Amino acid sequence: SVATVSYIINNREDQKISPETRNKVLQIINLLDYTPNQAAKSLVTQKSQIVALHYKEAESYLQKAEQLHFINKLTNFLHNKNYYLMCLSEHYIEKIDLADVILTLDVAKEDFYKIGNANFSPLIALDSFIDDPVFFQINSDFQKLKKQAIQYFGETTFTFVSLPINDEKRKELIQNTFSSIKYVKSVEELDNFDYKNVLIIDSILEQLISNYYNKLYISGFSDEKFEKIFQAIEWASQRIEINNHNIVV
């Protein structure tokens, strides 16, 4: 029946369908090269499967490269989770009707609230501290990074090297965690790079000083962090009540 085909296409598990029938329908779907219409699915589920990303346009080429690396990685990750990514810079703070959830990347607190005031979709802050129990915020665990660096270098003397950071509380937390910090704005600043031990979380910096003999690279957006982002997207889009909205990875 039409209903049976619909159940199989939409992966309904609450209906009793024999394996033989399911396999036959899937074979025919494959032969016809059928893919479900996204608009039709949205009408049924009330979800667009679109995630919007708001980010502050980078000033330096290094930051632009790092943003692009993150966006590419996030796009591929969300695609594997059946989500699509929409990217917007800070110049486009407006109502976004299409998105199930809005992510922000390293934006200032005041800009975060501007985005929130313009939208009804749930907001999730990445790499910034909003400290508002209404919103999820997902950040790196700098104390954990410090412990990993001490274990790796075998001593407490090392320098945390990073691209410039917009969020003030995140910068303050880094300042209180690491005794030696170097922010890199341009490639030229790496010409006289002579630090003994270096901890890096930015992909572009890891590539630029890839031959540096005493370096520890721990991605600021690990697979674990992406999974936490996805979990927060699911919780937020489904309006599931969670006690802890402050996630550190």
What name fits each language-model region?
Residues 5, 25, 51, 74, ...:
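Hydrophobic structural packing positions in well-ordered secondary structure
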Residues 6, 43-60, 157-163:
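Short beta-strand segments enriched in small/hydrophobic residues
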Residues 136-161, 222-244:
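Hydrophobic alpha-helical segments within soluble ligand-binding/sensing domains
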Residues 1-44:
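N-terminal helix-turn-helix DNA-binding module of bacterial transcription factors
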